[in-house]
Amino acid sequence: MVKVYAPASSANMSVGFDVLGAAVIPVDGALLGDVVTVEAAETFGLNNLGRFADKLPSEPRENIVYQCWERFCQELGKQIPVAMTLEKNMPIGSGLGSSACSVVAALMAMNEHCGKPLNDTRLLALMGELEGRISGSIHYDNVAPCFLGGMQLMIEENDIISQQVPGFDEWLWVLAYPGIKVSTAEARAILPAQYRRQDCIAHGRHLAGFIHACYSRQPELAAKLMKDVIAEPYRERLLPGFRQARQAVAEIGAVASGISGSGPTLFALCDKPDTAQRVADWLGKNYLQNQEGFVHICRLDTAGARVLEN
C-alpha cells in the first residue's frame, strides 16, 4: 500500500499571475491537503472519503483521480489494477489548489506503487495536463508547488517546468476560505482579453522586482511588490467583502494580501506571529460566510507532496 499526501497551495501570489505558486502547511501541524492511497487489486476501484467527498462527481469516470489512473496506465502502455482511495480534505473551487492536491497525490501514488517508472519532470507534465482538464487550461502554478514544495516560478523552457524561488522564513500566510465556491473557469472568463501598456509594464516591474527581492533577501521590498494589476481588479467583484477585508488586514499589520488562486480564499502575509493571529481572528469573524469556511495560519511547505506510508 502507498499513501501520499499533497499540500494546499496558493497560486499567483498577487504578483505572479499563472507563473508563481507556493505550497503551504498550517503552523499547528494540521495537514491541509488531500491524501490518496493505492493498493494492488484484481480490478480498478475508487473510494471517496473526507470532509468534502460529498462535493465530488457522482459518476466515477468524472472523478479526476479516476482520470489520473487512466492517463497513467496509458503512459505506461498497460492496465494497472489497483484500489484507490481519495481522502478529499480540500474544498472544491476554493483557490487553494484543491484539484491539484488530488491530481498530485494520485499520480505520485501511482508512480510510487509502480516503482517510479516516470521521473519528476514527466510526472509534473502529466499533473499539469490532468489539472488543466478541470481548470480549462494547462498551467502549473498549483501542481508545481504542491508536488515539489516551496515557492515555485514557472519557467517552461529548456525542459524545465518550474524552479524554486527562496522564500522568507518569517512570513506567515493567513489563509481564509469563506465557504463559497468560485470556479476557476468563471474567474478566468471575467478577465479582459487585452491589457493597457502601462499595466503590462507595471506587472513586469512588480514580478521582476519581487523575484529580485527574494534572491537579495529583502522581505519588506518583496511584500511591497506583491501587487496585482492583471486579475484582482476584475475578480474582486466575485468575492463578497474582499475589499473591506484587505483594508482591515492591512490596518492590523499584514505586509501584503490578495486573492489566493482564483478565489474566494484570501491570503494575508504577516511577519509577526501575534499579527498573524489578530488577522486570523478578524477574518474568522468577518470574512467567513458559512460553516464550511475556515482560517489557517500557515508557513511555506518546503517538502511538497510526500509518502505517508509505503
Swiss-Prot record:
Q: Where are the transmembrane segments?
A: none
Keyword field:
Amino-acid biosynthesis, ATP-binding, Cytoplasm, Kinase, Nucleotide-binding, Threonine biosynthesis, Transferase
Q: Where in the cell is it found?
A: Cytoplasm
Q: List the disulfide bonds.
A: none
Kindly report, in one word, the top-level EC class recorded for this enzyme: transferase
InterPro entries from the UniProt entry: GHMP_kinase_C_dom (IPR013750), GHMP_kinase_C_sf (IPR036554), GHMP_kinase_N_dom (IPR006204), GHMP_knse_ATP-bd_CS (IPR006203), Homoserine_kinase (IPR000870), Ribosomal_Su5_D2-typ_SF (IPR020568), Ribsml_uS5_D2-typ_fold_subgr (IPR014721)
EC id: 2.7.1.39
Q: Name one GO cellular component term.
A: cytoplasm
Q: Does the keyword Nucleotide-binding apply?
A: yes
Q: Which PANTHER family match?
A: HOMOSERINE KINASE, HOMOSERINE/4-DIPHOSPHOCYTIDYL-2-C-METHYL-D-ERYTHRITOL KINASE
Q: What is this protein called?
A: Homoserine kinase
